[in-house]
Amino acid sequence: MRVLVQAEPFEFGAEAQTFADGAAGAGAIVTFTGLVRDLSGALEAMEIEHYPGMTERAIAAIAEEARQRWHLIDALVIHRHGRLGPSEPIMMVATAAAHRAEAFAAAEFLMDYLKSRAPFWKKEVTAGGADWVAAKEADEAALGRW
């Protein structure tokens, strides 16, 4: 199981291949890559802050919970911080399990956690200024199903 919190870009195809190569015995692998969205057409950047050490521990704990709950063979979580532009990869989740239902459920669980509870603070930067991103009710509701 790997948890990476990094400023550097990652290549999701290469990460997925490396993950698959190490998932011996898996019957299913699910990967998800999230991108910085520009819903308004005015986003210049997304600035993401975190508390080093605490963030990695929190994500590792939830990844371990997913591993035990869905009997995962392996899991990978990558989340970037720093200044990211529109359409840049911001995070990746990969899960490997004996069966697809477990791999999909664990991946969704991890994505819901990252979206609503992981200790990241996001600020949208536009030509008009910068605003902190507030948690969305839909994200909290998604996490509530677990």
Curated annotation (Swiss-Prot):
- Which keywords does UniProt give here? Molybdenum cofactor biosynthesis, Transferase
Q: Does the keyword Transferase apply?
A: yes
Q: What's a Pfam family this protein contains?
A: MoaE
Taxonomic classification, please? Bacteria, Pseudomonadati, Pseudomonadota, Alphaproteobacteria, Rhodobacterales
Report the record's Gene Ontology biological process terms.
Mo-molybdopterin cofactor biosynthetic process
Give the protein's function. Converts molybdopterin precursor Z into molybdopterin. This requires the incorporation of two sulfur atoms into precursor Z to generate a dithiolene group. The sulfur is provided by MoaD.
Q: Which GO terms describe its molecular function?
A: molybdopterin synthase activity
Its name, as the record gives it, is Molybdopterin synthase catalytic subunit
Summarize subunit and interaction data from the UniProt record for this chain.
Heterotetramer of 2 MoaD subunits and 2 MoaE subunits. Also stable as homodimer. The enzyme changes between these two forms during catalysis.
For this protein, what reaction is catalysed? 2 [molybdopterin-synthase sulfur-carrier protein]-C-terminal-Gly-aminoethanethioate + cyclic pyranopterin phosphate + H2O = molybdopterin + 2 [molybdopterin-synthase sulfur-carrier protein]-C-terminal Gly-Gly + 2 H(+)
Q: Where does substrate bind?
A: L35, V36, R37, H99, R100, K115, K122, K123, E124
* Pathway where it operates: Cofactor biosynthesis; molybdopterin biosynthesis
Which gene is the coding source of this polypeptide chain? moaE
Question: Which family is annotated?
Answer: Belongs to the MoaE family.
What the entry lists under InterPro entries is as follows: MoaE_sf, Mopterin_biosynth_MoaE
Species, as recorded: Cereibacter sphaeroides (strain ATCC 17023 / DSM 158 / JCM 6121 / CCUG 31486 / LMG 2827 / NBRC 12203 / NCIMB 8253 / ATH 2.4.1.) (Rhodobacter sphaeroides)
> What Enzyme Commission number(s) apply to this enzyme?
2.8.1.12
Top EC class per UniProt?
transferase
PANTHER family the UniProt entry points to: MOLYBDOPTERIN SYNTHASE RELATED
